[in-house]
């Protein structure tokens, strides 16, 4: 297995390469992903993870069909890597790829629903402690928020809705 979760077959004699490619194709396996081409798309487990915010499998499949399969015969200036991460935790390192997608949720507090609880569940749920009660109302600094989505649905009064 490679770091991009592909199989690498070593030791195939040069004169058997075409036969090997044909054999793999007959069994539903694609070859490629080497050289100056789009490499296989990688993704995290997405919504099956407790932190997953987007369906990485569905998105990766669309990207795979469009770019890996669709650009299979296109020679690029260099290898092109794509990764899809389901949240800002960065498990598959989308920001280190040529194209990276990171699932995010931007909270939009509803000040009408905030009751200024002394033990605010939104404050408690944030891993970077961004939400604060200011004058008895919830405030989330948009510049400091990491958009991890852990606050969604935590307020029993709906001050931060499920989006």
Language-model segments: residues:
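Ferredoxin-like iron-sulfur electron-transfer modules
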Residues: 45-48, 67-72, 76-79, 100-153, ...
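Small-residue-enriched alpha-helical segments and adjacent helix-cap loops
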Residues: 1-107, 113-116
């Amino acid at each position: 297995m490679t770091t991009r979760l592909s199989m690498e077959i070593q030791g195939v004699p040069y004169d058997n390469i075409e036969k090997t490619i044909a054999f793999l194709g007959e069994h539903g396996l694609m070859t490629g992903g080497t050289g100056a081409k789009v490499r296989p798309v990688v993704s995290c487990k997405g919504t099956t993870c407790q932190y997953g915010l987007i369906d990485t499998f569905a998105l990766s499949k669309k990207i795979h069909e469009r770019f890996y399969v669709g650009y299979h015969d296109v020679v690029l200036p260099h290898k092109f890597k794509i990764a899809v991460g389901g949240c800002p935790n960065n498990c598959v390192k989308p920001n280190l790829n040529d194209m990276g997608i990171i699932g995010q949720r931007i909270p939009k507090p509803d000040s009408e629903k905030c009751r200024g609880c002394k033990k605010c569940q939104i404050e408690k749920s944030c891993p970077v402690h961004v939400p604060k009660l200011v004058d008895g109302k919830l405030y989330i600094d948009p510049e400091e928020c990491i958009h991890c989505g852990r606050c969604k649905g935590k307020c029993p009064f709906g001050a931060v809705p499920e989006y």
